[in-house]
C-alpha cells in the first residue's frame, strides 16, 4: 500500500518536473497578426504585424517570403505577380523589393510589414486571395521555420449558403441540416458570418451549432501544424485516444500539452 502511495507521489513529482521543463524550454515568441487588406483590379495590399511577446529576449527574422494564389470556387489559381515589402519598426521604414533583409525584433515590441503585390495581366478584383507567409525565426531557441496562411476575401462576397445537406439521425422528432459555406478566414467576423448564412434558414426554436475549427479560424486561434514543435510525450500519449479524435494525433496532443500540461492529462 505504501509502495503504491510512494509511486504515485514520485510519478507526480516527475510529471511536474517535465511540465516545468516544457514551460520554460526556450521557444520563439514571435507571432504574425494580420491587420487589414484591400484588393483592387490588379493590386493586393496587405498589412500585418510581427510581434515579439518575450519580456527579455530579442529575436531575428532572417527570412520571410510571401506567396499569392487566386482562389475561385475552392480552386487555387496561379497568379504571376511582382511584390514589394515595406518594413516599419517605428523609427524608420525600409523598402524591400527583391529580397528580405534580416531584422531584429526587440522584446515586447513589434514591426509593421506592408505588402504591395502587382498582378500581371490578371483581373483579381472579384476573386479571393490565398496568401501564404513562409518565414523563419532565429534566437536563443535555435532556428525554426514557420508558416502563416490567410484568406483575403473578394470585395463583393455575399454570405449565402452554397448548399443545405440533410443529415440522417435516429430521432425522428428532429431534423439536422448542415449549411455549406464559402471558405472562411480570420477576416470573417463570426457573429455576422453566422447570421448572414443562416438568416433565411433558422426558425424559432432551432438550435444553431458551429464547428470548433471554423470558429477558431475566424477568431485567429487556429494553429498551423507546421508551427508546432512536437515532443516525445505527445507522440506517445496520442496512442491512448480514439482514432477519430484530434487527440489521437501528435498535433492535437501537443496543443493540449501546451495548454494544460502532461500531469493533468495523465491523471484526467
Predicted regions and their residues:
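N-terminal and secondary-structure boundary signal
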Residues: 2-268
Amino acid at each position: 500500500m505504501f509502495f503504491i502511495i510512494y509511486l504515485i507521489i514520485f510519478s507526480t513529482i516527475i510529471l511536474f518536473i517535465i511540465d516545468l521543463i516544457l514551460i520554460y524550454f526556450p521557444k520563439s515568441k514571435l507571432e504574425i497578426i494580420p491587420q487589414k487588406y484591400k484588393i483592387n483590379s490588379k493590386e493586393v495590399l496587405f498589412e500585418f504585424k510581427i510581434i515579439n511577446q518575450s519580456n527579455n529576449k530579442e529575436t531575428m527574422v532572417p527570412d520571410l517570403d510571401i506567396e499569392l494564389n487566386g482562389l475561385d470556387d475552392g480552386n487555387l489559381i496561379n497568379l504571376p505577380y511582382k511584390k514589394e515589402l515595406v518594413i516599419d519598426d517605428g523609427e524608420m521604414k525600409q523598402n524591400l523589393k527583391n529580397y528580405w533583409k534580416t531584422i531584429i525584433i526587440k522584446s515586447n515590441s513589434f514591426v509593421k510589414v506592408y505588402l504591395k503585390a502587382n498582378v500581371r495581366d490578371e483581373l483579381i478584383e472579384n476573386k479571393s486571395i490565398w496568401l501564404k507567409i513562409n518565414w523563419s525565426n532565429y534566437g536563443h531557441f535555435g532556428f525554426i521555420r514557420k508558416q502563416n496562411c490567410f484568406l483575403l476575401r473578394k470585395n463583393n462576397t455575399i454570405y449565402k449558403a452554397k448548399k443545405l445537406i440533410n443529415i440522417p439521425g435516429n430521432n425522428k422528432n428532429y431534423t439536422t441540416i448542415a449549411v455549406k459555406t464559402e471558405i472562411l478566414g480570420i477576416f470573417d467576423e463570426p457573429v455576422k458570418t453566422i447570421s448572414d448564412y443562416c438568416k433565411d434558414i433558422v426558425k424559432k426554436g432551432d438550435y444553431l451549432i458551429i464547428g470548433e475549427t471554423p470558429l477558431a479560424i475566424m477568431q485567429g486561434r487556429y494553429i498551423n501544424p507546421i508551427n508546432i514543435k512536437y515532443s516525445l510525450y505527445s507522440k506517445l500519449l496520442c496512442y491512448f485516444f480514439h482514432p477519430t479524435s484530434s487527440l489521437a494525433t501528435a498535433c492535437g496532443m501537443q496543443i493540449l500539452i501546451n495548454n494544460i500540461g502532461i500531469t493533468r492529462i495523465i491523471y484526467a
